[in-house]
Amino acid sequence: MSNIWIKGWSGRLGNNIIQLKNAIQLAVSKNYNVIMPRHKYFSKTYICLNKQIGINSKRISDPNNYFYTSDLPNIDYNRVLQILKDCFTIKDVKALDAEDLVIHIRSGDIFDKDPHPGYIMPPLSYYVDIIRANTFKIIYLIAEDQKNPCINALLKLYPTIQFELQPLEKDIRLILGAVNVVSSYGSMIDSLLLFSNNIKRIYRPSYSTILFKLESVEYIITDLDEYKESMSPWRNTQEQLDKMINLSNLQYI
């Protein structure tokens, strides 16, 4: 009898949620406990599923700290999700209006020198098409900074969009309160929406893998496969940045 041991956190919050979810899934399948480092958004450092196992019992670690874990056991996923939710510090977020929209645009380090070549962000036309195809009341935009050129371009097109650079916790609460969400690319939205009691509709690019398929949620996919191929590998060149904000491919004129 052992403890599943997350020795360290890898990357950002979205990745950390994946690490913990994977560790819990393994622990539930084996009736083990979970040891993890302190984290601002997790209320526990020890998850006890088996009282016969102590914190000083044998520890099982993973070279990837359970971020990349293949062949996860097929078990009661609802139990895994409930344990995960119990660990998260932000709870009971009130829903936004059903006709409001929250857009998350990934920015940050992928717009610096030597970015990850696989992190290709959707173009401006992706967001504009979604807005034009619907009649949303209030549109909220979430981003960590304004390095992604789509952010300022979208704000220029739609000055009434609600946007401010704010602490991560406020962004999380907006995401968890959202009924309608637009995802860009990365693990943050998929991971955070595991904790949502309000989400009904998720817009996402076709080349973005659905990490966790949520029940009773409508997924609306925009075909951006050709765009993705034309932008690979991502180098953050001026040509690529210009292509991101080119509106020649709009579906809804």
Task: Please give the residue ranges for each predicted region.
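Secretory-pathway luminal glycosyltransferase catalytic domains
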Residues: 3, 34, 38-137, 149, ...
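A structural signal for short, well-ordered beta-strand segments and their strand-loop junctions
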Residues: 5-6, 33-38, 102-104, 140-142, ...
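A short glycine/serine-rich beta->alpha loop
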Residues: 6-11, 178-180
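Short, flexible loop/turn elements at secondary-structure junctions
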Residues: 10, 107-109, 143-146
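Catalytic phosphate/metal-binding cores of nucleic-acid and nucleotide-processing enzymes, i.e., regions
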Residues: 18, 23-30, 38, 95-99, ...
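Non-transmembrane alpha-helical segments in soluble domains
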Residues: 24, 128-131, 152, 193
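Donor-binding and catalytic core of enzymes assembling or modifying cell-surface/extracellular glycoconjugates
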Residues: 136-221
